[in-house]
Amino acid sequence: MFKFKIFAFITLMTFAFGIALVGDALAGEKVKLRSVMYGTKWEQINVGDEEGHVIAVYEAKGIDTNMQGKKFMDGWLYRESGLMDMNGKAGTWSAQGYGECTDRDGDKIFITWEGKKDKKETGEGTNAILKGTGKWQGIQGKGTWVAVPAVDNRWYSDGELEVELPR
């Protein structure tokens, strides 16, 4: 159950980042997003050096919501993949990965993210836009996120992203 909560948490973080990239944002505008995600794949290897220490690869999917009521990234599909080094017994993890945000027309924004959780309920980190396709080609941005576990393999992530849209 712990691995699913962690998986959900990381997926949520990435999802939140994806939400920030869609819609009617202005150049240099900060966008507030919420991503709700669920884990779809999880593979782990026990490290063996201490109880609860594992390395895991996962995938998650979800939906982005623009918390400012704008169209940018609102309702976009989000897919995330990541690598996690975690200790379920200690309640800590560090992770990094990639996200793919897809708008209603099929154009995409790709992101990279990293973060950690140190014995608290939430994880936090940073993200950055790698590139966009179609109308999002040339988009740039970076931001922060906080992920919160919900139930089982589901979580949500709140983030803020400063975006510069393509010209």
Regions found by a protein language model. Name each.
Residues 10-20:
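Bacterial N-terminal signal peptides
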Residues 19-27:
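Sec/Tat signal peptide C-region and signal peptidase I cleavage site
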Residues 26-167:
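Beta-strand-enriched cores of mature, soluble protein domains
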